[in-house]
Regions:
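Non-catalytic interface/targeting segments
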Residues: 1-53, 60-61, 80-82, 89-119
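Conserved residues at the C-terminal ends of beta-strands
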Residues: 69
Length: 119
């Protein structure tokens, strides 16, 4: 299983960036192999539909779960269509959020928690 966290930097020591579509990076952990790596969120460069572009990026990297602060309706729909589970309303360091996820201490989102464009 691959878990991605929207991040302000490229390591597990960096803070979560709460904006799914506009975060700089995703730190990805493969729970099977234990491998960790970061990808640049090229979706953030979109002039519109950054959340959808970001969902496509995560799908292309075979992500199963994404942990973030906020997700809008278009991004949530795209993530749901890609069968990527979404956990929102989080904050803190990437490593702490991954630990909370592994321990079952994060709540799966049932829908978007912000309006379009982060409003």
């Amino acid at each position: 299983m691959r878990v991605a966290v929207s991040a302000s930097g490229q390591t597990q020591l960096d803070e979560l960036n709460p904006r799914l579509g506009r975060c700089e990076y995703f730190v990805i952990v493969d729970d099977v192999s234990g491998e960790t790596w970061a990808i640049e969120n090229t979706g953030r460069l979109s002039t519109g539909a950054a959340g959808i572009a970001t969902a496509t990026l995560l799908h292309n990297h075979q992500v199963d779960v994404v942990i973030t602060g906020n997700v809008g309706p278009n991004a949530f729909t795209a993530l749901e269509a890609a069968e990527i589970k979404v956990y929102t309303g989080t904050k803190g360091k990437v490593q702490d959020l991954l630990e909370q996820y592994r321990n079952g201490n994060l709540s799966k989102a049932s829908g978007p928690n912000v309006g379009p464009h982060g409003s």
